Structures are given as C-alpha cells and as structure tokens.
Amino acid sequence: MAQVNILRHNPIAIFSNPTEIIVKDDKNQVFRLVEPSGNVGTQYPNDLGSEWFGTIENLNNNLKTCGVEWSDVYKTDVLWTTPSTERDTCDQVKDDFNAIYAPMINSMTGCSINSNRMARFTHPEGFPDPVALFEVQIKAVRGENVSVNNGVIDYGYWQDHQPSGASVMHSRDGKTITSIGPNLAEEMAFVMFEHYEKPFAEAGVDFKKQTVWMEILVAVDDDPEKTWERIEIVRRAFEEYYGNDRPSGLIYPVSRIPNLDGIVEPQPRVVAGDVSIDRSGEIENGFATWTTITYGGITEVMTSAVGGIDAGVELLTLDSRIKEAGGKGLKEDGVFNNAYVVAGPSSQENRDRLKDFNTEFSGWYEGTAPAGRTAQYVGGIQQASYQSGISNRAIYCK
C-alpha cells in the first residue's frame, strides 16, 4: 500500500523549513523528497562570495536535517536581486557569481553537482530580506532505487525530467548565437523546438504530450514599457504550441535572463515511463489550472499560480484546486508554495505590501504548519491587474 508522510520542520507563521516528504509507493520502493524554503546568506558580509558561502551553509544544514546531501539535489533556482538597469552591470554580477557557484559548493559540501539550474535577475526590490543579493531554492531526492543526473530523476519505472531553463542561445558553425531577432513568437518557438522538443524526441519522449509544468520568464528591463505586450505575445505562442495539452504553470516578467541578449526563458517539467497525467480541463491565464501525475499509487498536484490582491483568497483557491484534483487540501497535502509580490517604484510601499501579504498568508494557515516557501518581488505575475500570486505543489496517496 502506498504511503505519504509530510514532515514540516521548524514551522513559523509563513513557512516550514525544510519540508521532508517520505514516500513509499505501491511497489514498496521508499524515497524521500526534501524541499528547503528559499535561503539567503545575509548572516555574513554583503558581498557575493560571503552571501553564497552563507547560503550554502544554510541549505546544507537543511539537507542534513533530512538525511540527504548536495549530490541528491536535482533542482536549483538562483534568483538575483537586480543590481542595475544597465546590461553590463548585470553581466558582471552574473559572471562573478558563476565563477564561485560550483567551486564553493564542491569545497564546502564535498559533493558533485547533479542538479539543473535556472537563474534570473528578478527585480531591484529583491526579496523579503532587503539586503540579500540573491535567494536560492533547491530540491533534493534520495532513495535506494532513485538516481539523479543532469536534471533527470530516474525512479526505475518512471522518469521525472526537469531540465535547466533555456534561452535562444545556441551554437552555429562554431559560433555562439545569442539572439535570432526581435520576433518574440519566433524566439519562443525556437527554444521550445530546438532545446526541448527535438532532444526529447531523440530520447523517445513526446514533449508536447508529456509536459506537466511550465515556468516562463520574460525579460523586460531593456524596454519596460513593453512588459505586458511581450508577455501576451509569449503567452499566445505557448498556447498555440501546446493546444489542448496545456500544462499548468506561470508566466511573469523578470529584469533579465542570463542570456542578456534573449527575452524568453521557459523551463518545463516532463514525465515519462509508467506514470499517468491528468489535467484539469480548465484554462486560466493560458495554463491548465492544475495538472496531476500519478506513479506507484502516489499523486502529485501542480497548481498554476493564482493571482489577485489577497494572499488568503489565493491560498483558498489553491486549496479548492488540490481538492478538485483528488487531494485533501492545501494544509494537508501542500509541500511548497512559490509566492510572488508585485513591486512598484516605491520601496516603502513594496515593503508594506509584503507585510500585508504575509499577514493574509499567515492568517490562512493559522493553527497549522505551512508548506515550504520562497517569496520574491516581481514586476507582475500572470496578469497586469494582479498584485500578488502563489503557486503550489502538493502530494498525496488515496
């Protein structure tokens, strides 16, 4: 009989850290999923190296709490506070961080890196900790029958593909191409086909049919006035590409993606093998409102980001969608929330909005241990009218 046990360690009003999920599937295979909340390293001086040292230290402690290590990490999100609207400044920060990224992990943990990675410059307002230069979120898995390699988690009878985010950057005739021109629909189509559909097809996976989640970043700092024009172009390209097989997910503006000449960076989650996919049949903001995958008697629910003006209402909507997908609810089955607070030009107003958001958020969870969480300031989420948004991943067995 399949079993799921969710352990929410060190809970506070807005998140637990880390969240540990111990799973036994109906094949009697046991594995654990570990999801620390987003971490910063501001216990050390305010420079890239010191904060990265502190972030690794914090995340490593989270992993050890759950009996796993850095070589078990399969997903890494790097979110940089935007240091400037100037391209060259962002390029330098990116290069400086990348120079210390892997060497410091290796030296501090003694582990190799098996994880994918998706990075972006989020917004000048940054994160709940106002001095943080970046925030990092990781996910890990360990089990006797589980292997992790380059973003692919192989459970033996099914595979969970979580590749790194990709832009239009590619090689041609020995040269690195970073842009294919101003047509965003063509840029999105190129990335989807060349970086995802084609290599998945070579591996025998139907990318369109088997994508269950999609996060889409749209860079806007080179021309902020076109923020929502760009998002709508990319959203339409996404809708046309997937048709009736729409995954759940989200789309939002970021300052810049790592390929500073590119605009679009999508990152999918794709499953293959002995795993079934179910979609809600309801489309909102271009995405299925929820998608489930079921393997070995275990079901995961991925709910698209719900936007609005009140975090409590957004959480209530997520709760109803998890129930609609067959789960007990967000408080019972939720393992991780990604929170997005829309920032404007006034830093004080942005900070006040975060306080309100957290009050609404903690009010909904009052009396229970919340799921893990990462929160970030963004220039928007899903639609221009939304002031905040939350997406969630939940797991249960019937």
Describe the role of every protein-language-model region:
Residues 1-80, 84-212, 221-331, 337, ...:
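N-terminal presequence-like segments and the immediate start of the first folded domain
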Residues 216, 339-341:
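Short tight loops/turns at secondary-structure junctions
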